[in-house]
Each structure stands twice: as C-alpha cells, then as structure tokens.
C-alpha cells in the first residue's frame, strides 16, 4: 500500500532518531524501494484524458456531430423483463412507523384495537361477511374437538346475535375440549335449517394456534385475508434486527423492483408477525419471485439466501410468512407445513392427481383416511391406493376412473375440488399424428379440413368472402373423426357456390357444453388483413380469419436452401438482428426505395449493406402473425415521437405459428402476396451468400383464448387445479403435451420446408422443455443440414405445476451441442444488464474480475456450463432494453450532445464490438450497433425533463455526473410500442461519413472486425480442448500491475495454422502498459490488425493509439488492438493505411508534463529478466509448445537486435523512432532523476554504515 508523504516522513524521523546501525539499512532500503518504483511492469498515465489520441503530425479538428433533429422527427419504445407499465415508479405501501429492533424471540402478537383477548382454551372464528343479512337468525354449528358439539339442529348453534365485531368482521369464540384439541369443524346455518356455507374445518397447526378466518367465499385461513389484488409478505427475525432488511421482487406484481440494485423495499411496517410489506398484484396473478436482502452487506452477500424464492399460489393465499434465512415460504404464521389440497385433475382412466400446499410429513394412511372421491352422480368411488410425491407436492389416487366424459369430486378434510380433464388423459386417449389444417387441392377446387378438438360437441367451418372478410358465404358442419378430430372436404357439392376456394377465408365454429366460440385454425397458412382494434366488435373479430392458400405455388420457384459464405459450423456465424420495418422506415431513404417502406420487398433493396458489412446470418424479429397491430395502416409512416399507442410491434404477441403477418406485405389484403414476397426476400438473402434466421415465439401467445377456444385446459401448461398458466397476457404453451409439442415441431418443419430458412431464435426458450426443442432441431436439420438454432436460455421454466422436467435453458448446454443460448454473463460484465443496467461495467469504467472477463471471452461464462464454444451466443446488445450507444451514455453519465462525449461513447462502443467479435463462440449484433444506434426521444417538447404524468413510456431519464439532465434526456428502452421516429435504422448515421464521422468510423471498424474474424480460425475454435490448448491469458491478476478487478485484458490465441494472435484491451481512462515478459516476447514482431481507428485482416501501416515499450506494449486510454505473428515468425505484409478522417478532427491532446505523472515510469532496460517470468492463466500454459518457445526466443532476439531501417519495414517502428510518432511521455527524464536519487541514497547509506563501524 502506498503511504502518504506525511506518514512516510514521520516514520523516517523516528528511525533516524532511534537507530544507529539501522540508518544505513533504511537508506539502502529506500533506494531499493525507489528502484522498484523506477521499474513498474504495468504503468498508467493517470492524467491522460479519456478522449486522448496519439499526437499525429497532421493534426485536424473534429466537427461536432449533427443533432438527430436534422434527420429525425418521430416517436418512441419498451422492456422485456418487466410488464408494459414498467415505467411506473415502485408503489410504496402506507406503513406504520418502524419500531426499534426488539430482542424478542417470537413474533409480535399485539391484538387489534377493536378485538378482545382470546381466553385460554378458546378458539376464535372470524367471518368476513355473514351469508345472510339477519345475523340474529344465523349461527355457528360446531363439532369435533369442541367442548360441547352443537345439538338440536338448527337452533342449537352459537348465535351470531352474540357475535362481536372488529376491523375484519364478526367473530365468535368456541370453547375447546382441552389441550388435546386438534380439529374444529363448523358451518354457518340459519334458523330455517339451511347450511349456508357447507361443512368447514380447521386443523390446529400448533397448540398455541387459537383463531382462524373465513373470507367472503368462506374459505378458511390461519391468518387474516388481505384485500383482493394484494399479497402481504411477513418477515420475522428472531434477533429482532430489521435494519436495512428489504425485499426485491418480480413476477405477477404491478410494480416489480426496478430501483438501483440492491435498493429493495424496506421492511418498515410492523404487524402481528414481525415486519411486513404489502405488494399490489396484477390481475389474475398466480406467482411472484423475490429475494430477501440485507443491504448492509456487499456483493452477493447482500442476499440473505442466495437462491430466489418463488411463490406460486397467489390464487389461494394473500399472506406469506418468512423467518430468518429459512428457505421455506410458509402460508401460516406458525411456520409449519400446512397440508391442504389445492386442486385435482383426472389424469388417466385409473388415476386422479391432487395437488397439495405441502406434503412434508404426510403419511399414506392419513391421506387415505381423510380423502374421498365421488363420481358425477354422487356415488363414492373406491380408492385402491395412493402415491405421495412429497417433492412434487401431489398425491395420485388409484381406482376405476374410466368415465372420461364427466368430472369427479375429490375431497381432503374440508378442501373439495371438481376434477378437470388433464392433458395426460387427453394424450392417452386422443393424441393424433395425422394431417391437420386446410389442404387446398385441385387448383383450388377442393379443400380438405382437419381440426383436433376432442371435447367439442359440434364443429362447423364458417366461410367468408374473398373480397369481404366480414361477409359470410356459408357454414358447413364437420364430421367427427378418429382420436378427437373433426373432418370435412369442401368442394362444389357443399352448396357454397364456390368453384375456386383460393383466397377465401374461414374460421371454425365450435360448440361445447352449450357454449359456441369462433376459433382460428392453428395450422392456417395465411390470414386476412388483421386489425386488433376490431377485436371487441364480436367473436368473429376477436381472432384472425384463416385463408385458403397453396404456398407451394407462390413466389420464386427456384428458392432453395442457402449456401452461406464463410460458414460451416455455428461458431462461424456472425448473426445480425434486424426488424423488417425499422430497416427501411427512415424517411432519409424514401426517395431511394422503389418498394413501400417497412416491407419485405423494401428490405431487399438494402441487403447489399449487410453483405458489405460481412455478416453471415440476418435474424429477423418475428414475422409470423402477431396480435396487437392494424395491418391495414402499415403504409402510414409514424414520424412523430411516441413510445406508446403506436401502430408498431416487435411481434412477441403471436396469433398463429404458420401464417406471416400482413404488416410487412405491400398488400395485407392479399393473403398470397405476403407469402410470395417473403419467399423472394429469403431468395435474395441467399443470392448474396447470407442466411435467414427467424425469431419465433412459442413460449406464449397474445391471448389465452386463441388456444383455449380450440381445446380447453390442454394447449397450455397448467396449474395444479387444471387452469392454464399465463405469461405476458397470453398462455404459456405447454410443449410437454403431445399435441402442443406437435404444433411447435410441425410449425418449424413447415417454415423450413416452405421458406427455406436457415435458422431459428427461440424467444424465452427457457420456458420450454429441452426435449421439445431438441426434437424441433432434429426435424429441421433433417431438411436443412446447415440450419442453426439459438435461444434465450434464461432459467424461466414454469411448466405444469409440480411437474419438473429438464428445461431448454442455460443449464441444458452441458447436455447438448444442438442449440445455443445467449450469454448474459458477458453482456452484464462488459456493458451491464438486468437488474443493474446502467451501472459502470468493463467498457464503461467499472472494474471487473479479469478472470471472469477472460472466461467469457473464451466461451466459458461463469453462470452456466458450456461444453462447446458453439453453445454460447456472445452479445452486448439486442432489441431489448437500451441500445449499446445509449447504455454507454447512461453508464458514464456523459451527454452525447457534446462532441467530446460523443467521441468517447464511440470509443467505448468500438471496444465492446471488438471484444464480442474476437470472442470464442458465436457473435451476435443488434441492428445499428455497428454505427451507434440511439433511441433518444428527440421531440422538441422533451428537450428538458417534463412532469411525471408526461414522461414517455418505457423511458430512462439520463443525467450527467453532476445530476444535470442531458439535452433531450429521455431514452427509450424496449421500443415495441414506439413510432418509426424512435425505431428507425438511421441510414445517414450509418453511411454519411461527412455528417457523422464517428458513426461511420464505428461501422467501418465493425466491418473490419468481421473480416478479421472470418480470415482465421483463431477466433472460431470448435472445442473446449482447442481453446484450452491455444488460448492463454497474458494479464494475470496480481502480476505485472494487473489488479484482480481491472479494466484491462490481454490474451493470446494460436490458430490451427500456427499463426499467433493477441488481443489487448485498455478500457481505462488513462494509458496502460502491458508487460509481455519472455513468454510473449514474440508478439513484438507482430503486425497490428486493429488499432483505435480501424480494424481488418491485413496489417495497418501506421497504427494509432499504441506504442512498444521495453517491457511490452502501451495502449492509449479506451484503446484496443489485435496483433498477429505469422506461422514462420514474420509478419504479413502491412497494406492497410490509416484512413484520414472524412472531416477535420479535434486537436490531439499532448501528454501532461512528467511531474504530473509520478507513477508513469518507463521500464529500464537494465532490469533483470527475473521480473519478466511467463504468466498465464491455464494450468498447462506454463509450458509452451516447442515450436512456439523457439519462435518466442528468436522473435525476442530479433527485436533486441533489430535496426531502425529493418524495423521500419514492420508496421510498428522500433522504440527510438516510435517516440517521434507518439507523445513524448517524459519517462526517460524521470528515470534519470530517479536513478540519480537512488545513487545518492545508496552512498549516504554506505557512509552511515562505515561511520558506525568505526564508532563501534
């Protein structure tokens, strides 16, 4: 640790005064300290400004970038991990003042003011609302463990005339028969002898339990039920210390935690069971997750328990109870596992399955004793056996349950449920593998229809006119077929008056248990023009109408699978994500387009840009039919800034998995045109040597009814009681169910076979079971062997309640090499991400663990195990959240309206892009990431902050380090409901180097990086063993000035052909020096492929931002480089000249004077080689391959003996000449002064020793 001058001075005075013989030693020791200071192994120019560039001979001036208002006039956007209203601030519950921490060891039990204490041996029953108005005519009839069971029905009940009232409602106290009392049974009746509530009972969970509550539906609880739409989280600590204890929560809640992590909601309100927080819930909430936090701690220790809590029974409970760091979530305030039945399903002809709140401690004989099953006639059905699944919290009853047409009634104690027909039973009885959908034949003269709906009583097809989708032509009944199918053939005999069915529309009319619905064919191949604004008109408009089409006859007939350039395996892919409308909605290119903007056809006109950039695959945001949009207005440009209520959509609200949306068609009213136009787009992508990846959304639908109307309680994952599970407002498709899995696989096969696509990206893939995704992959690869699949592998699997299975998430990667997942670990460490988005990360000045960064760069993320580099999608930006440019601005708190800040943001952006494109695995680029795309809300009315009720939806208000808002401070994240003004791809910024030099420089930089990546296998290694053998960390933490957490990294890769590459990144705000030692001395002979201004596959003649030093390599602030040493130890010919800026640039900064940088000293040539020992990260890296050792040795010798003339032939001059090109750091002068001081101190030390020797 460096001492302060005053501290050092004090120590020295004490030493001279107190010691004689030690004085010389102190001086000699001081000289050694100074010697060490004179020879640092990694140095920093601490005063170097962030935007420093090398002091070139030809200094130019950088023009301030044009403001977006010159080219923009439009609207705004949105967010994935939070609901559409995530912009709202976290609601604070009105809470009682917090009391001082108590040392009590049990929860607070203060009674409600209006409530009298409960006498010993009494049990209080609270009633929210009496069944009838006349309380005097109602009573509580009791039996079981009460002192005096009620007698003389009905008048022998405890009369509510004597009931007392509190804040909740009425209550009566019942005397128990003694301490052994365990069960209190009761009902509310009236004097007329009517049982008003049905039989109820409550089990005493613990001896001290002395009250229970009935809600308005007369369900029994061990706590006071909360108002609808609220859950209370109670937290009891035995130490009484609630200081800085808080809750971080998400899920089906109105306002998920969204403050800066880990600033959760504090436990401040005090209640009967410790502290509590009331959380408002979404409508029909089912589950939420949370973390208990201790904000007095740091890092991961802030979590009281490291694992997420998840509560999935919000339908049945409005309070939960937590205790200390107990892993359990209790549904009673006594912290015991309360066995309650929560649902029942008919799962097979010999089995019924019931779900329970818990089965901890449950015994088979007790379950049998307290269970009862009756059929629809009320007759008891014998239970022959029970199987208890404690982990799954379910009991399977065995018996004769062969009646599959009617429900059964299952009861356990006072809990009673009517069975729902489970998907298991439907799979066992009705699963079908034949052809489904509408098959148009005989030149349109015939249509074969097949629909699967086993519970339907009747099915008809309603046919609509081809020129007027609202006009009914006629209705034809379908006939019941095998295994739950309904079939019909439409032709001239159906009396519809149609000779050619092509282009006509249809829906299915399904009658079931007296209810009729109109449903969309899930296998429809095209649709009528869709307008979700009409959904409320009637049933015919709440879902789209399918169209009779023959896709095989539409579009280019020569369409085939793509032959993708520079691509053999998934590690070779460079994926570029784009939205069809965004790519051509910029009004700046309106005159250049010959086709309507925002369409498949217009996209074709800009494909050459992507070909020139060098990407291998274009990933299109969802192009299949989505719900919330008006396709009839797709031609209207949304030029005003808006971030809500826009006729715009990303497409993550699917309506059909076979039909394309009409939003990107030149004529949405023509159901054939969208098919032909999309085929043409794929064909043109293939002609340019690129592939097409479709973003698909099988994890949820836009509306639950889309599939529930087809077959209730089947297509979705189910809760334990048999109701469908939801997500984002729609249903979670249950891909473990046979017909749902079939739908997914059939859809994938159809899209590959019909449109010849080259891959799929699965939205929220972790919501699916791994088996279904694997099956889809194999089916698709059987058609297109070059196809790739990737997905969001977040751990979000819900599945059917209490039926765990292997999910298609990040944890699956160690078991498969078929599908890849996005790495949030590299994203979060390089630029930040949920829940810490906007906090400084590696490329934005936040120090990060160097080993963690290195592991991510070699496709070994720290939060999941990848057994192949191809398992990992390397990315730092996607359509979700803020763009990369915007998140950098937010993180460094610098307003891009200032030219110097704009340039700095781009420097950091280029660092991030370089790290992703030189990483192992598969790189992924968000459209516009290459040029610095922004979604800044540049409406003149929003140039400064506005009132809270005027804040744009899904926006962040950005401020600088002083707290001042940016110019136009609102930036939109998740722009799925924003206008074209917000979402457009800005072609001027991407291509006009004169108006936007920084943007075009960044774009060209990425183009060069892609070319570099594709020029060698070094960055595309195919196995972990290859990576282990060929990639070595240079910047080992704890050595050579590299800290454990730092903002620099350097590593070396040996390509399969023997070429050696090295990547160095300095994300610091000052220059940093990298010590190469002996192990990496051969890099001195390298050519530079990337510097601070450009990148490519050939050497740069005059690289900028770096210089060789005697210890190694020095990089300017915010600079990265890629080096290459060819196989034979000589560099490739350097041909890339440094391109002059397209506009005059800002004057270069001169390095500060030496005295301003006392620690920036250049290593001296006389330092022993012992300080340059090899240092590498992997265990086997201490021994280089013999050829590499020989090469390193020869390269080092060559560097030491190289003449100036010879070095000038390389692309980096030798050190003497280099000083003329790069800023003079003053290091030599500093070294001379230091060594003079060292010599003087050493002489003084010797003098003291000699003097003392004589005196002694």
UniProtKB/Swiss-Prot annotation:
Residues reported to bind Ca(2+) 1: 646, 648, 977
Signal sequence region: 1-44
Keyword Calcium: yes
Disruption phenotype: Reduced numbers of pneumococci relative to wild-type 48 hours post-infection in the lungs and blood of the mouse infection model confirming a role for this protein in invasive disease.
Top-level taxon of origin: Bacteria
Record-annotated site: Transition state stabilizer: 880
Gene3D superfamilies according to UniProt: 2.60.40.1110, 2.60.40.1220, Glycosidases, Golgi alpha-mannosidase II, Immunoglobulins
UniProt binding sites for substrate: 141-143, 153, 199, 248-250, 261, 303, 308, 652-653, 728, 794, 824, 827, 834, 881, 954, 974-976
Protein name as it appears in the record: Pullulanase A
Modes of activity regulation: Inhibited by 4-O-alpha-D-glucopyranosylmoranoline (G1M).
Basic and acidic residues bias locations: 1134-1172
Xref: InterPro entries: Carb-bd-like_fold (IPR013784), CBM41_pullulanase (IPR005323), Cu-Rt/internalin_Ig-like (IPR014755), Glyco_hydro_13_cat_dom (IPR006047), Glyco_hydro_13_N (IPR004193), Glyco_hydro_b (IPR013780), Glycoside_hydrolase_SF (IPR017853), Ig-like_fold (IPR013783)
Gene Ontology biological process terms, A to Z: carbohydrate metabolic process
GO cellular component: cell surface; extracellular region
Cellular localisation: Secreted, Cell wall; Cell surface
Chemical reaction(s) catalysed: Hydrolysis of (1->6)-alpha-D-glucosidic linkages in pullulan, amylopectin and glycogen, and in the alpha- and beta-limit dextrins of amylopectin and glycogen
Protein task: Virulence factor. Involved in the degradation of glycogen of the mammalian host cells. Hydrolyzes the alpha-1,6-branchpoints of glycogen. Hydrolyzes pullulan. Does not hydrolyze dextran. Binds to mouse lung alveolar type II cells that are rich in glycogen stores.
Family: Belongs to the glycosyl hydrolase 13 family.
Skewed-composition ranges (Polar residues): 79-90, 1200-1210
Keyword Ribosomal protein: no
Any one GO molecular function term: pullulanase activity
Domain description: The N-terminal tandem family 41 carbohydrate-binding modules (CBM) are involved in carbohydrate binding. The C-terminal glycosyl hydrolase 13 (GH13) domain is involved in catalysis.
Originating species: Streptococcus pneumoniae serotype 2 (strain D39 / NCTC 7466)
Swiss-Prot/TrEMBL keywords: Calcium, Cell wall, Glycosidase, Hydrolase, Metal-binding, Peptidoglycan-anchor, Secreted, Signal, Virulence
Annotated Low complexity bias: 48-61, 99-111, 1181-1194
Topology class, membrane: Peptidoglycan-anchor
């Amino acid at each position: 640790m460096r001492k302060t001058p005053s501290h050092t001075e004090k120590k020295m005075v004490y030493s001279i005064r107190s010691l004689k013989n030690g004085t010389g030693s102190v001086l000699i020791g001081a000289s050694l300290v100074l010697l060490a200071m004179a020879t640092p192994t990694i140095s920093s120019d601490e005063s170097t400004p962030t935007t420093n560039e090398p002091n070139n001979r030809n200094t130019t001036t950088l023009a301030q970038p044009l403001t977006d208002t010159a080219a923009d006039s439009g609207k705004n956007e949105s967010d994935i991990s939070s609901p559409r209203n995530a912009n709202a601030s976290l609601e604070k519950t009105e809470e009682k003042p917090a009391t001082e921490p108590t040392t009590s060891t049990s929860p607070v039990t203060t009674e409600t003011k209006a409530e009298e204490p409960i006498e010993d041996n009494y049990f209080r029953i609270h009633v929210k609302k009496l069944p009838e108005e006349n309380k005097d005519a109602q009573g509580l009839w009791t039996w079981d463990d009460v002192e005096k069971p009620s007698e003389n029905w009905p008048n022998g009940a405890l009369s509510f005339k004597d009931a007392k009232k509190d804040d909740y409602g009425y209550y009566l106290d019942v005397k128990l028969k003694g301490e052994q009392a365990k069960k209190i049974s009761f009902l509310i009746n009236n004097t007329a002898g009517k049982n008003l509530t049905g039989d109820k009972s409550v089990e005493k969970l613990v001896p001290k339990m002395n009250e229970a509550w009935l809600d308005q539906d007369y369900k029994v609880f061990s706590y006071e039920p909360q108002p609808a739409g609220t859950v209370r989280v109670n937290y009891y600590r035995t130490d009484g210390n609630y200081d800085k204890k808080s809750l971080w929560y998400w899920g089906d809640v109105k306002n998920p935690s969204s403050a800066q992590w880990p600033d959760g909601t504090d436990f401040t309100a005090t209640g009967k069971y410790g502290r509590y927080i009331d959380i408002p819930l979404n409508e029909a909430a089912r589950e939420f997750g949370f973390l208990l936090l201790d904000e007095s701690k740091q890092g991961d220790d802030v979590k009281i328990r490291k694992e997420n809590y998840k509560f999935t029974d919000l339908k049945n409970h409005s309070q939960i109870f937590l205790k200390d760091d107990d892993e359990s979530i209790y549904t009673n305030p006594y912290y015991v596992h309360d066995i309650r039945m929560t649902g029942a399903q008919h799962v097979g002809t010999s089995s019924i399955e019931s779900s329970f709140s818990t089965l901890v401690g449950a015994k088979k004989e007790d379950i049998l004793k307290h269970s009862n099953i009756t059929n629809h006639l009320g007759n008891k059905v014998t239970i022959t056996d029970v199987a208890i699944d404690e982990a799954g919290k379910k009991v399977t009853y065995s018996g004769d349950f062969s009646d599959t047409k009617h429900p059964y009634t299952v009861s356990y104690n006072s809990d009673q449920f009517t069975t729902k027909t489970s998907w298991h039973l439907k799979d066992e009885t009705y699963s079908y593998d034949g052809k489904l959908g509408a098959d148009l034949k005989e030149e349109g003269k015939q249509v074969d229809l097949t629909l699967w709906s086993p519970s339907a009583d009747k099915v008809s097809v309603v046919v609509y006119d081809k020129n007027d989708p609202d006009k009914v032509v006629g209705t034809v009944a379908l006939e019941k077929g095998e295994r739950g199918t309904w079939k019909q053939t439409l032709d001239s005999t159906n009396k519809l008056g149609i000779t050619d069915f092509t282009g006509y529309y249809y829906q299915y009319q399904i009658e079931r248990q007296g209810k009729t619905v109109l449903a969309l064919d899930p296998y429809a191949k095209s649709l009528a023009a869709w307008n979700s604004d009409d959904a409320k008109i009637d049933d015919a408009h709440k879902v789209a109408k399918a169209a009779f089409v023959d896709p095989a006859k539409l579009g280019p007939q020569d369409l085939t699978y793509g032959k993708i350039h520079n691509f053999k395996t998934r590690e070779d892919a460079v994926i570029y994500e784009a939205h069809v409308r965004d790519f051509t909605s910029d009004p700046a290119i309106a005159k250049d387009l010959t086709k309507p903007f925002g369409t498949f056809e217009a996209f074709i006109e800009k494909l050459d840009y992507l070909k020139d950039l060098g990407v291998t695959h274009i990933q299109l945001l969802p192009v299949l039919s989505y719900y919330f949009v008006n396709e009839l207005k797709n031609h209207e440009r949304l030029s005003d800034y808006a971030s809500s209520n826009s006729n715009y959509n990303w497409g993550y609200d699917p309506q059909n998995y076979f039909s394309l949306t009409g939003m990107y068609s030149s004529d949405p009213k023509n159901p054939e045109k969208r098919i032909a136009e999309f085929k043409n787009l794929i064909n043109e992508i293939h002609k340019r040597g690129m592939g097409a990846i479709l973003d698909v959304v099988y994890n949820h639908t836009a509306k639950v009814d889309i599939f529930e109307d087809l077959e209730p309680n089947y297509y979705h994952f189910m809760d334990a009681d048999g109701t469908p599970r939801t997500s984002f407002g729609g249903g979670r498709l249950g891909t473990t169910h046979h017909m749902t899995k079939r739908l997914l696989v059939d859809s994938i096969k159809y899209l590959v076979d019909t449109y010849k696509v080259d891959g799929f990206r699965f939205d929220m893939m972790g919501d699916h079971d791994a088996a279904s995704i694997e099956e889809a992959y194999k089916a698709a690869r059987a058609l297109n062997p070059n196809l790739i699949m990737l997905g969001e592998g977040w751990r979000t699997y819900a599945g059917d309640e209490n039926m765990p299975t292997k999910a298609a998430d990040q944890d699956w990667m160690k078991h498969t090499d078929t599908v890849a997942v996005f790495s949030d670990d590299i994203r979060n460490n390089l630029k930040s991400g949920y829940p810490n988005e906007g906090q400084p990360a590696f490329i934005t000045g936040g120090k990060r663990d160097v080993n963690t960064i290195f592991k991510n760069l070699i496709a070994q993320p720290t939060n999941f195990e990848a057994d192949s580099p191809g398992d990992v999608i390397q990315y730092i930006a996607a359509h979700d959240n803020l763009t990369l440019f915007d998140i950098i601005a937010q993180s460094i708190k610098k307003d891009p309206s200032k030219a110097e800040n704009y340039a700095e943001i781009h420097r950091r952006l280029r660092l991030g892009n370089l790290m992703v494109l030189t990483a192992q695995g598969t790189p992924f680029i968000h459209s516009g990431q290459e040029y610095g795309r922004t979604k800044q809300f540049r409406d003149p009315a929003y140039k400064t902050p506005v009132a809270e009720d005027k804040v744009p939806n899904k926006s962040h208000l950005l401020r600088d380090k002083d707290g001042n808002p940016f110019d136009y401070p609102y930036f939109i994240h998740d722009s799925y409901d924003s206008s074209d003004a917000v979402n457009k791809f800005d072609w001027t910024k991407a291509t006009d180097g004169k108006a936007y030099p920084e943007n075009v420089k960044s774009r060209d930089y990425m183009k060069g990086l892609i070319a570099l990546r594709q020029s060698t296998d070094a960055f595309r290694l195919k196995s972990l063993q290859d990576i282990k053998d060929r990639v070595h960390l240079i910047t080992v933490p704890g050595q050579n000035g590299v800290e454990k957490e730092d903002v620099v990294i350097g590593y070396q890769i040996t390509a399969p052909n023997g070429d050696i590459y090295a990547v160095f990144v300095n994300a610091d705000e000052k220059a940093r020096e990298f010590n190469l030692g002996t192990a990496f001395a051969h890099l001195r002979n390298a050519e530079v492929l990337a510097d601070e201004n450009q990148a490519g596959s050939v050497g740069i003649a005059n690289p900028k931002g770096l210089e060789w030093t005697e210890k190694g390599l020095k990089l300017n602030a915010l600079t990265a480089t890629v080096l290459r040493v060819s196989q034979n130890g000589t560099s490739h010919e350097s041909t890339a000249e440094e391109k002059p800026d397209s506009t005059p640039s800002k004057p270069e900064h001169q390095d500060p004077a030496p005295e301003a940088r006392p620690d920036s000293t250049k290593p001296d040539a006389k330092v022993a080689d012992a300080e340059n020992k090899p240092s590498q990260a992997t265990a086997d890296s201490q021994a280089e391959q013999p050829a590499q050792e020989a090469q390193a040795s020869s390269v080092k010798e060559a560097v030491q003996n190289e003449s100036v003339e010879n070095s000038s032939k390389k692309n980096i001059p030798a050190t003497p000449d280099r000083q003329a090109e790069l800023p003079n750091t003053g290091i030599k002068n500093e070294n001379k002064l230091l060594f003079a001081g060292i010599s003087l101190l050493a002489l003084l030390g010797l003098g003291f020793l000699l003097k003392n020797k004589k005196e002694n």
